[in-house]
């Protein structure tokens, strides 16, 4: 992805968040120049835990078809050291018909919450013993109600609804066509993008950046490229 595209995507997402009165911490708005002027040491938790902006096309070249924009608000270390939080939180902009590809987590348990906008479609499968798709029924909890669905079921989450996904449940999600973009929340155990994502089809979790203009905001995996 090019910084020009990322800049535009983040501008759109900030406007989308503002529609729902979503407020982010001050560092969400720091420019690269501001980051470069700061003492790095007090901000080490942000860098180590990849807090902040994330724009990904999952290695694809069509962000509108496959991609996600999110901001990680809080996180902890796998194993609890050096950062003892046992939980994580994200706020996400899931665009209409924009797919987050099928994946599961070995360790993370998460609630995916439709905070507003359109409907969120979530497709579900269990993982089999070889990390492929199982044909077994999938058991999940929707807002405290335990439900079992056939493999490959697509559940529709309207604004206010949520789903709890346990480890080893494959899931893919997107904004339902005809209903607009979706404001999605995620509350989970510790998030470890480097070691706890299993995508059904191998892909890049973070997009490679091809320089064409300066970034207006830094992505969570780019801080150390810009900060001495």
Swiss-Prot record:
Optimum temperature is 40 degrees Celsius. Gene3D superfamilies: Jelly Rolls. Its EC number is 5.3.1.15, 5.3.1.7. It comes from the Bacteria. Its cofactor is Mn(2+). Optimum pH is 7.5. Keywords: Carbohydrate metabolism, Isomerase, Manganese, Metal-binding. It holds the Pfam family Lyx_isomer. GO terms for molecular function: D-lyxose ketol-isomerase activity; mannose isomerase activity; metal ion binding. CDD domains: cupin_EcSI. InterPro entries: D-lyxose_isomer, EcSI_cupin, RmlC-like_jellyroll. Mn(2+) binds at residues 103, 105, 110, 171. It catalyses: D-lyxose = D-xylulose; D-mannose = D-fructose. Sugar isomerase that catalyzes the reversible isomerization of D-lyxose to D-xylulose, and D-mannose to D-fructose. Shows optimum activity using D-lyxose as substrate, but can also effectively catalyze the isomerization between D-fructose and D-mannose. Shows lower activity with L-gulose, D-talose and L-ribose. Belongs to the D-lyxose ketol-isomerase family. Homodimer. This is D-lyxose/D-mannose isomerase. It comes from Serratia proteamaculans. The gene is lyxi.
């Amino acid at each position: 992805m090019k910084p020009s595209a990322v800049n535009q995507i983040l501008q759109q997402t900030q406007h989308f968040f503002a529609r729902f009165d979503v407020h982010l911490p001050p560092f969400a708005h720091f420019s690269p120049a501001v980051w470069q002027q700061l003492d790095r040491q007090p901000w080490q938790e942000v860098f180590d835990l990849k807090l902040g902006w994330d724009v990904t096309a999952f290695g694809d070249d069509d962000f509108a078809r496959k991609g996600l924009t999110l901001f990680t608000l809080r996180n902890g270390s796998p194993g609890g050291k050096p950062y003892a939080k046992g939980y994580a939180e994200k706020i996400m902009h899931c665009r209409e018909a924009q797919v987050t590809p099928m994946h599961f987590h070995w360790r993370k348990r998460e609630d995916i919450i439709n905070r507003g906008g359109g409907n969120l479609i979530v497709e579900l499968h269990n993982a089999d013993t070889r990390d492929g798709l199982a044909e077994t029924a999938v058991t999940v909890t929707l807002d405290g109600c335990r439900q079992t669905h056939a493999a490959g079921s697509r559940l529709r989450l309207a604004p206010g609804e949520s789903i709890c996904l346990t480890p080893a449940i494959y899931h893919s999600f997107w904004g339902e066509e005809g209903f607009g973009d979706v404001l999605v929340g995620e509350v989970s155990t510790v998030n470890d993008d480097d070691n706890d994502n299993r995508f059904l089809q191998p892909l890049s979790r973070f997009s490679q950046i091809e320089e064409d203009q300066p970034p207006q905001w830094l992505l969570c995996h780019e801080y150390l490229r810009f900060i001495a």
